Amino acid sequence: MFGLKQFYQNEVKVKLAQELDIKNPMLLPKLEKIVISVGAGAHAKDMKIMQNIAQTISLIAGQKAVITKAKKSVAGFKIREGMAVGAKVTLRNKRMYNFLEKLIVISLPRVKDFRGISRNGFDGRGNYTFGINEQLIFPEVVYDDIMVSHGMNITMVTSTDNDKEAFKLLELLGLPFAKVR
């Protein structure tokens, strides 16, 4: 599953240079990293569930997940400093492209009534974030092994600081964006 990186090198770069009118190949936008994160919410107090969430994300990403801890105590949310509140994985290079290809080809088509991902997830600096409601769309996740059904946020960080260029890059890589009405 290393075809997406070669597709980027051979075809996407050429199309980006033409469409964005960029002469210097070093200035072409590229995908730098993908961050998969889960907030545990009400389940943050149960360490077994936290371990299960981290294990599930590790299976999906193919890399060990890190359990994130609260930086501050917040009485309204009943969170103390240092308490586990979620898990995340940062993917780069080969694993990043493998995950993206699996997401585009296998996982997103398994979502019920899928009409594309939202175009509104850009942050103004060339990064794109979208959410997935449940982890069962990934083939590595076995229904019997999960304790709690949870979603996840997927953030794609690009080398450009322009949303238009980042959108063009992700679209050419094959991300299925929703059609504009």
UniProtKB/Swiss-Prot annotation:
InterPro entries: Ribosomal_uL5, Ribosomal_uL5_bac-type, Ribosomal_uL5_C, Ribosomal_uL5_CS, Ribosomal_uL5_dom_sf, Ribosomal_uL5_N. Keywords: Ribonucleoprotein, Ribosomal protein, RNA-binding, rRNA-binding, tRNA-binding. GO terms for cellular component: ribonucleoprotein complex; ribosome. Disulfide bonds: none annotated. PROSITE patterns: RIBOSOMAL_L5. Transmembrane segments: none annotated. Pfam families: Ribosomal_L5, Ribosomal_L5_C. GO terms for molecular function: rRNA binding; structural constituent of ribosome; tRNA binding. It comes from the Bacteria. Part of the 50S ribosomal subunit; part of the 5S rRNA/L5/L18/L25 subcomplex. Contacts the 5S rRNA and the P site tRNA. Forms a bridge to the 30S subunit in the 70S ribosome. This is one of the proteins that bind and probably mediate the attachment of the 5S RNA into the large ribosomal subunit, where it forms part of the central protuberance. In the 70S ribosome it contacts protein S13 of the 30S subunit (bridge B1b), connecting the 2 subunits; this bridge is implicated in subunit movement. Contacts the P site tRNA; the 5S rRNA and some of its associated proteins might help stabilize positioning of ribosome-bound tRNAs. Belongs to the universal ribosomal protein uL5 family. HAMAP family: Ribosomal_uL5_B. This is Large ribosomal subunit protein uL5. The gene is rplE.
